Amino acid sequence: MAVLGLQGVRGGVGTTTITAALAWSLQMLGENVLVVDACPDNLLRLSFNVDFTHRQGWARAMLDGQDWRDAGLRYTSQLDLLPFGQLSIEEQENPQHWQTRLSDICSGLQQLKASGRYQWILIDLPRDASQITHQLLSLCDHSLAIVNVDANCHIRLHQQALPDGAHILINDFRIGSQVQDDIYQLWLQSQRRLLPMLIHRDEAMAECLAAKQPVGEYRSDALAAEEILTLANWCLLNYSGLKTPVGSAS
């Protein structure tokens, strides 16, 4: 059993789409999966055919004094979703007023992990330094840092810390881009925790959100879907549920 956190080194690198796709691929491999949206943007639900007007979620429930477990949704017999929930405009503008009220989700997820109900709990983490994000990261057995091969992410890899033991996953890699190829070759020599697979740019990754499906469900024959399935198999082989030792190159 493993808790896996996915976090972009910046916004806009495709973390939410990859989280949904990986959850789908793991359940296709026979695993029981819970996918949790920890981002106040509350977008993960839209990859699982949840209505746009659906406001419920674990954070919304906690802020309203309700049971967060009632916010869970069943997508398939082996894949459950826990949306974040919709914040009001005032809440979005004043996160310091409510973030400290969400810490109980960590003990709740610990209990779910201990129950053995799921083989995997995937958490879509925001790119921020909030207390709840740090608490959820500390709960994770493993973490993936999602990057695009560009100068922005290259700079960030050198000036901001990654979670301890995080592996780096490249998304949206473009064949024929000279600058991407140059940066990628540099990373192959300098980034010891770069995953041995990457996700190429694929129109299906853009289309699947419009279709409100994970990419592997929307188009299982797409290149990105096949690469995410390879990632899922890698996770099965390498993430046993024990925390990745800090400094490990595996």
Curated annotation (Swiss-Prot):
A GO-annotated cellular component: cytoplasm
GO molecular function: ATP binding
Binding sites annotated in the UniProt record for ATP: V9, R10, G11, G12, V13, G14, T15, T16
Phenotype upon changing A249K: In strain: 1094
Description of the deletion phenotype: Deletion abolishes cellulose production.
Function: Essential for cellulose biosynthesis, shown for strain 1094, a commensal, natural cellulose producer. Also shown in strain W3110 which has a restored reading frame (TAG stop codon to TTG for amino acid 6, called strain AR3110), this protein. May play a role in subcellular localization of an active cellulose biosynthesis apparatus at the bacterial cell pole. The combination of cellulose and the curli fiber network confer cohesion, elasticity and tissue-like properties to colonies.
The protein's name: Cellulose biosynthesis protein BcsQ
Biological source species: Escherichia coli (strain K12)
